[in-house]
Amino acid sequence: MTLWINGDWITGQGASRVKRNPVSGEVLWQGNDADAAQVGLACRAARAAFPRWARLSFGDRQVRVERFAALLESNKAELTAIIARETGKPRWEAATEVTAMINKIAISIKAYHVRTGEQRSEMPDGAASLRHRPHGVLAVFGPYNFPGHLPNGHIVPALLAGNTIIFKPSELTPWSGEAVMRLWQQAGLPPGVLNLVQGGRETGQALSALEDLDGLLFTGSANTGYQLHRQLSGQPEKILALEMGGNNPLIIDEAADIDAAVHLTIQSAFVTAGQRCTCARRLLLKSGAQGDAFLARLVAVSQRLTPGTWDDEPQPFIGGLISEQAAQQVVTAWHELEAMGGRTLLAPRLLQAGTSLLTPGIIEMTGVTGVPDEEVFGPLLRVWRYDNFDEAIRMANNTRFGLSCGLVSPEREKFDQLLLEARAGIVNWNKPLTGAASTAPFGGIGASGNHRPSAWYAADYCAWPMASLESDSLTLPATLNPGLDFSDEVVR
C-alpha cells in the first residue's frame, strides 16, 4: 500500500512500478500508481480537511510542522540512506539534504511572519489591517534530484499558511516520497491535510487537470513546466509556481588562485553529478594565457573524479545519475555537440553498462554556431572563450533561461556591472553557482520559472493578502461630501 489518502494507506489502482538502485540494480520499492479516480479521491479528502485546518491557529499548525522536524532529526540516518540509495548520490550529500530539510522548518516559520503575517496600523477613525489567507487545495509536484528537500520547500510553507496538499513525488523517487510521508503521518497531521499519490505522467496529468484544485507548485524540467503552464492557461484563479532549471553561465574573468577557481567550477558544474538546476552548464572563459592555464588545470582535476556507489568508502565526490537512461542522454548530448564542431577536452564515460556511473565531460564550443539553448541535466560542461567583459555578459544573457550566473574576478566593479546587466535570479561573485542562502529567495526569470520556491519567498505564493478597513463602531462623519444632506428638514 503506497498511497496515503485521507489518513489511510491504500493500494494504487494504476500501473505497477518498480524502483531500482540506479547503480546496482537492486529493487528498492514496488507499488502501483494512483489512477484518476484515486487522484480525485485525494482532492476530495484535501478539500474536506481544508476548513478545519485553515481555522486552526498558526501555533497549532506550527506544532505539527515542528514535530515533523524532530522526526527528521531522529530518523536522519535512515532517510539519508533511502535518498542516497534511490537517487544514486553519495551518502554525504544525501545527509546534507536531510539537514537542509530540518533547517527549512525554522526558516519557513520565520518567513511566514515576515512575509505574510498580520499587520495593523491605526487611523483617526479606525484601523487598516493586512492578513493572509490560504488558497485551499494545492498540488505539489516533486523532482528527483532532491526528493526530500525541494518538495519540502513547497509543502512546509503551504501547510503553515493553512493549505491542504496533494503531493506527487517524481516517479523516479517513490521510495523517498513514501518515507517522508510516513514521518508526516507520525507528526500527527489530521486526515486529508497531506495526501500522497504516486505515479508518472498519467497521474500527473490527472492531478493537474482537477477542477477543484486551487494551485499547483512545481519543481522540474522546463518542458514539463511549459506543459503545466499551457494546461492551466485561462485559469487565473489558480496559483501556479514553477521552478524549471537553467542553462547557467559561469564567467571566469581572472583567477589569481587557479586551483581555487577550479574548485569553484567543479562545485558549480559537477556536484550531484550535474543534477542541480543551478549547475553551471556554460563556462565563459577569458581568452589568453591565464585562461589556457585554468582550462588545462580544470581538465586535469576533473578527470580524477571517479563516480562511486552511495556507500563507497572513502566517499566519492559524485555518485550515479538518477538512471542509466539519464546518463545515456548526457552522452548523446555530448556526441551531438561534437558533431556540431565542438572540441572534446574531457570525454564523459559510462563506467559500466547497466549503471548510471558517468564521469564528467568538458567540451569547447568557441566559434560553433547554432548550439541549442537547452539544459543538459548532468555532468557536461561547455566552454566558450571571450575577449572582453561586455562580450562575456552578452554571452551569459544569451539564453531563454535565467536561473543562476556567476563571476570569478577580484574586481568589484565588474561584479557591480554584472548585477546591473545579468538576467538571472541568482548572481554570485567568487562563490559556486550551486550555493544559495536559505534565507534568500531562490528561483529565476524567463524559462527558469516565475515565483521563488523553497522557504523564504515561498510564503508569498502559499497565501493571498486580505486588506481591511476596520472600526468597532459606526458613526456619521463630522464632515460630509458635497451633495449629501442629513439635516432634519423635510424636503418639499
Curated annotation (Swiss-Prot):
It is an enzyme of class 1 (oxidoreductase). InterPro entries: Ald_DH/histidinol_DH (IPR016161), Ald_DH_C (IPR016163), Ald_DH_CS_CYS (IPR016160), Ald_DH_CS_GLU (IPR029510), Ald_DH_N (IPR016162), Aldehyde_DH_dom (IPR015590), SuccinylGlu_semiald_DH_AstD (IPR017649). GO terms for molecular function: aldehyde dehydrogenase [NAD(P)+] activity; succinylglutamate-semialdehyde dehydrogenase activity. Keywords: Arginine metabolism, NAD, Oxidoreductase. Its EC number is 1.2.1.71. NAD(+) binds at residues 220-225. Pathway: Amino-acid degradation; L-arginine degradation via AST pathway; L-glutamate and succinate from L-arginine: step 4/5. SUPFAM superfamilies: ALDH-like (SSF53720). The active site is at residues 243, 277. It catalyses: N-succinyl-L-glutamate 5-semialdehyde + NAD(+) + H2O = N-succinyl-L-glutamate + NADH + 2 H(+). One of its GO terms (biological process) is arginine catabolic process to glutamate. Catalyzes the NAD-dependent reduction of succinylglutamate semialdehyde into succinylglutamate. Belongs to the aldehyde dehydrogenase family. AstD subfamily. This is N-succinylglutamate 5-semialdehyde dehydrogenase. It comes from Escherichia coli (strain SMS-3-5 / SECEC). The gene is astD.
